[in-house]
Amino acid sequence: MSKEKFERTKPHVNVGTIGHVDHGKTTLTAAITTVLAKHYGGAARAFDQIDNAPEEKARGITINTSHVEYDTPTRHYAHVDCPGHADYVKNMITGAAQMDGAILVVAATDGPMPQTREHILLGRQVGVPYIIVFLNKCDMVDDEELLELVEMEVRELLSQYDFPGDDTPIVRGSALQALNGVAEWEEKILELAGHLDTYIPEPERAIDQPFLLPIEDVFSISGRGTVVTGRVERGIIRTGDEVEIVGIKDTAKTTVTGVEMFRKLLDEGRAGENIGALLRGTKREEIERGQVLAKPGSITPHTDFESEVYVLSKDEGGRHTPFFKGYRPQFYFRTTDVTGTIELPEGVEMVMPGDNIKMTVSLIHPIAMDQGLRFAIREGGRTVGAGVVAKIIK
């Protein structure tokens, strides 16, 4: 049992494979689990186990995703792989599988293709912080100059979307040969694992980030004051801490005079816990659902932002018809809907169900937001799209 216990103390990092269709993402995923299991222990996963990915729902959207796990000597990885291009788009936009870093798979036989570019762009828009490149099918290319050319193209493409193309690790390998147990190609998988360990920094745990609690409910308790309830999204809140109430109205400061959970008084509330926070000198009507409690100065309210959006298809329960500029749906952030207007990119007249699109949104009330915040687009309580804040305008 002692081994199991030790495993859990390793840092946990979320990664995934991205790249063009048929460039070998799933084969590479299988190869990583197989080679690392052989060298460092753990469970190997066969190609077909990964390829028939189970359906899951994220924000009402059906996504096919495979989750595998593997270990290196220093870390534990959770790795996500999607069978289809549409699944990647949905996955990255909804944040169903948050990635601390991605492995971009490019076939050396093809070089960068349209989805290579699209996945890099999506990675930039949704805030995937690090990309490592696996140049696949190198066993089928014996021309060194060609490999160098493909490598150069990939680096240029990464730089175009503000990733550090010149410094990005690129591994030349063959996922299939590694999966088949050929030693020289297995080495390349170990080399890739080494880059995962060193190039992707250890993610900051939610509990170490600045305190944030999306407010779900507000009520007043006679003789004690106003209590807000919700689930702590990140950080820790302690009795006596000063906090800001951010969003919808002007930002206000107050002090937390008590933290309670299941009607018991605590000293603190931590990320992941459902708590009630008693606020000093704050009236019930000054606060509403949709605002957040936050560490002072850690988050600001905004109305205008650029976003990357996936519009649900009719089959997913989305709209049956396209929408045009001047569309005014509700944008659901954390716990509340806010009406907003949209601007479409130049030359785009309409958006069809099933499309993914970049759009600029202007909300009628400010919402506490930072880059990477996820939201749903709703019409009368029905989800018709999912999006992520790519850039704050004002």
From Swiss-Prot:
The gene is tuf1. Gene3D superfamilies: P-loop containing nucleotide triphosphate hydrolases, Translation factors. The lineage of its organism: Bacteria, Pseudomonadati, Pseudomonadota, Gammaproteobacteria, Pasteurellales. Residues 136-139 are annotated as: G4. Residues 174-176 are annotated as: G5. This is Elongation factor Tu 1. Residues 81-84 are annotated as: G3. HAMAP family: EF_Tu_B. GTP binds at residues 19-26, 81-85, 136-139. Its EC number is 3.6.5.3. Residues 19-26 are annotated as: G1. Mg(2+) binds at T26. Keywords: Cytoplasm, Elongation factor, GTP-binding, Hydrolase, Magnesium, Metal-binding, Nucleotide-binding, Protein biosynthesis. InterPro entries: EF-Tu_GTP-bd, EF-Tu_GTPase, EFTu-like_2, EFTU_2, G_TR_CS, P-loop_NTPase, Small_GTP-bd, T_Tr_GTP-bd_dom. GO terms for molecular function: GTP binding; GTPase activity; guanosine tetraphosphate binding; translation elongation factor activity. It comes from the Bacteria.
